[in-house]
Amino acid sequence: MSDATAALVSERVDKLLADVDPTAVDQAEFRGRQYDLGLAWVHFPEGYGGLGLPPVAQRDIDRRVYSAGAPYPGARHFFGLAMAGPTIVTNGDEAVKQRLLRRTFTGEDAWCQLFSEPGAGSDLAGLATRAVRDGDEWVISGQKVWNTLAHIADRGMLVARTDPEAPKHKGLTYFALDMHAPGVEVRPLRQITGEAEFNEVYLTEVRVPDADRIGDVGEGWRVSMTTLMNERTSIGGGGGGAPPRGSGAIAEAVRIWNEEAGDRSPANRDRLMRLWIEAEALRLTNIRAGQNRRAGNPGPEGSIAKLKFAEVNMAIYELCVDLLGADALVGFGYEMRRAENLGLTGPPGSARKMFLRSRANSIEGGTSEIQRNILGERVLGLPGEPRVDKDVPWSKVPR
């Protein structure tokens, strides 16, 4: 940061901490004041929770406010902070920005993502959920699936088809859905771990005000790319931006090596060191991806980080269960629980459970195969896969 930027950030943080004691007020009040001072998403424009400063300044802001006792927002607000906020500020109209951004940052609105469908996962543009205009409202019906933490969300980032006669990428529109609206039903999807972190969401003639539309009608695909770009980078960072060096899954592997490992062979020591190096390379790649994205210069790092996170996280938990040996076979229970946190990494002692949970890393947020296609076609310039539905109206595409 330049001296001028550092001075401005320091001045604003000093004012924030002088105005509001983070240990004496609730989280929403403190974060509301943080938003008003432009310290929420510091790279956003002024008036929208930012100061138009380089994104690197956010790290200094976060360090100071958390050191002063401000509570960390937690996984419940991950989707709003990492995905909905950037999507709204980039694509929303003035009224949407003023109405939703502050509530998203304070935590008054928790978000979920309503993209995938039973027949549209990797081929997201083939989604079938319909939105039909009725005056100043849209009537939306359809089904979404694999919706993380939808059961505790207030808003949903929803993409629906508004023009079935347009080609599949061109007939979509993006909405900020009220998850408490009549006609919204959330059902749990139980995982191999016993938890129900994911859900399926049924929409039955849900009425959504046109004021809750984000972006122009028919521009849903373009708007959704903003969301997906932020999602991939965030997942690459383990679900919460760039974590400290040596934290997350690799920290659990190191703990097991030091405290519980039954097989400290040279081969396993080599595996541990190689994975520590890969985890650190991934962390640095994700920092670079986040900075480039927030500066408006997104590159391939987001897809690289997402792809490598899946591979490294799975490999780390495989090493954990190998180090535990027979103890890894001891069950951890299969209790049905509606999760309130993202399950990308787990606390100490959860390696058995996380070994099973990590199997989903190469699927969620865009499969590893899709990430390789993106990198091959858009970065390396390789020819794309042949498409039979290009420029064909969605209604005419065989399904």
Tell where the protein language model's regions lie, with residue ranges.
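C-terminal helix-coil-helix/basic helical segment that borders enzyme active sites and/or dimer interfaces
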Residues: 25, 266, 280-343
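Amphipathic, small/basic residue-rich leader segments at the start of a protein or domain
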Residues: 1-79, 96-99, 103, 223, ...
